[in-house]
């Protein structure tokens, strides 16, 4: 009787199947986000990339954005773990890997199974039997509840941190668009690539987030940013002034002047 301490089925390794062009990367991520949540959620991603393209970011910055934004949107939370366990490929992998009658044991850190070690104060996982597969299947069907008021995981520490980091990154995208120049391109590309440094779960992830936030502050404080912002503002103001003059000229011409 074999016992399998199962781990969630992992997404296809991008190291082996990495899309080469920016458009291919975006298309792949849109497909993944549609499966992760829904088409509207994937649209949020694609619309941001379109905005960044139109904003003048170069290829390297757009690639960093395409990967970084996806990583923060597609957080592997309780709903995603349930979806991965519910995929037919998980059962197929078990059948191909093990012979005989399997006994599955799931180590679950989320409420209501997880807890805190009384000695170390660190999170610990609880065990659940094979009946969890049915629970995962039910969760996968209702993953649209993620982030809503009835999401039982919405206010746990990891979910709150994920929302904070995502909001900060979206602010960084706005920052990059308003401060973009030839002199700031490399710094802003590094800023948009910071999510690649965030890994793990629990206290490990918190440590990586803290390190990324420190680097974020350093990059945003680069003296070249204020120069680029002032220059971009002047260009924008000039365009608006010319457009206003053109509209005034059209009104004058149409009135018979």
Where are these regions (language model features)?
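Active-site loops and adjacent core secondary-structure elements that bind or stabilize anionic groups
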Residues: 1-246, 254-257
């Amino acid at each position: 009787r074999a016992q399998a301490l199962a781990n969630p089925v992992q997404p296809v390794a991008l190291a082996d199947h990495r899309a080469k062009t920016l458009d291919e990367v975006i298309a792949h991520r849109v497909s993944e986000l549609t499966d992760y949540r829904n088409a509207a959620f994937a649209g949020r991603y694609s619309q941001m990339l379109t905005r960044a393209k139109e904003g003048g970011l170069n290829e390297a910055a757009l690639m960093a954005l395409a990967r970084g934004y996806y990583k923060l949107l597609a957080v592997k939370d309780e709903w995603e773990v349930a979806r991965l366990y519910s995929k037919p490929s998980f059962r197929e992998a078990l059948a191909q890997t093990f012979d005989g009658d399997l006994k599955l044991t799931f180590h679950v850190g989320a409420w209501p199974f997880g807890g805190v070690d009384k000695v170390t104060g660190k999170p610990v996982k609880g065990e659940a039997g094979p009946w969890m597969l049915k629970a995962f299947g039910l969760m996968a069907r209702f993953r649209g509840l993620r982030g809503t008021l009835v999401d039982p995981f919405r206010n746990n520490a990891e979910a709150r941190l994920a929302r904070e980091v995502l909001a900060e990154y979206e602010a960084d995208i706005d920052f990059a668009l308003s401060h973009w120049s030839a002199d700031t391109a490399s710094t802003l590309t590094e800023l948009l690539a910071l999510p690649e440094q965030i890994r793990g779960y629990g206290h490990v992830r918190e440590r990586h987030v803290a390190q990324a936030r420190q680097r974020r502050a350093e990059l945003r404080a680069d003296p070249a940013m204020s120069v680029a912002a002032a220059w971009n503002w002047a260009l924008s103001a000039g365009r608006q002034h010319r457009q206003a003059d053109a509209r005034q000229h059209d009104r004058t011409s149409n009135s018979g002047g």
